[in-house]
Amino acid sequence: PNAEHHYFSDASIYLHVTAPGATLSSSMFDLKKEFALAEHGYDFGVRLPWRESFQKLYDSLLTPDGGGIVIAHPSWSHHPISYLEMLLDSDPRILGIEVFNNCSRIDYSDVSEDLWDAILSSGRQCFGFFVVDHPRPNRNWLGRIVLLPEERTAESCLRAMRRGRFYGAISGNGLRFEYIHFDGHMLTAACNRPVEFQLISKIGVINDITFGTKFHFEFPEADREKHTFLRLTAKEGNEIEKLYAQPFILTD
């Protein structure tokens, strides 16, 4: 289950969230009034304070230790970094942000990597989501996440999402991470096809791009505070596919 929640009564900013795992449908989204729902008493938007609405979403989660809230299209909504940090600090069940939202491409605001890195540079954990948003027929829609659950059940998938056991992909053409492992000192990864690996931290790209199917990086303990976080990407060709691993936070 999932639903989009928006138009909170106390939000002076264009806040949209999704809530994977929540069973509550808080409002309708008849944006173009195609279904005349407002005429039948269905409000457009939540019309509740966001904290109250978020608590209703938490209370409705399919499993209490899985799923949560994702902040939608932050670049399209022009969210200030301070506002995003405030939301993330309010509850650990706010999982992260949409780093890629294909529907926002029409406004040239589909990618939010800079916002993601800015949040991670503060030492906050923030998972990255890659989504289609509103698909239409006969379009090459992009954006998806690959969950790594322990079991093929909805509850296990939601727990994997809560724990960051997933990675992002743009086109979904079969490229995948075979493994990603970080023990605090060594980061290793592998893909099923040759790619360009790129490691990113607070200071930007670390070292040169690595070409091939395997990646390794030995992390100096003295550099922990300088980097704050590590996240790995794997790119196949030009505009063919790109994978995004979830970040490792290096600070307490």
Where do the PLM segments sit?
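Active-site regions of enzymes building and remodeling cell-envelope glycoconjugates
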Residues: N2, V17-T18, L95, R144-I145, ...
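C-terminal functional module detector
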Residues: D65, S122-F127, V132-D252
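A metal-dependent hydrolase metal-coordination microenvironment
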Residues: P1-G68, A72, V99-L115, V131, ...
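Histidine/acidic-residue-rich catalytic or RNA/ligand-binding cores of hydrolases
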Residues: S12-V17, H79-S90, Y108-E113, R136-E151, ...
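Glycine/proline-rich, flexible active-site/cofactor-binding loop segments
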Residues: P64-N102
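Short, hydrophobic/aliphatic alpha-helical segments
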Residues: V111-Q125
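Short, well-ordered alpha-helical segments in soluble proteins
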Residues: E98-S104, G123, R165
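Extracellular/periplasmic catalytic domains that process cell-envelope and extracellular macromolecules
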Residues: D10-I13, L62-T63, L88-P92, S121-G123
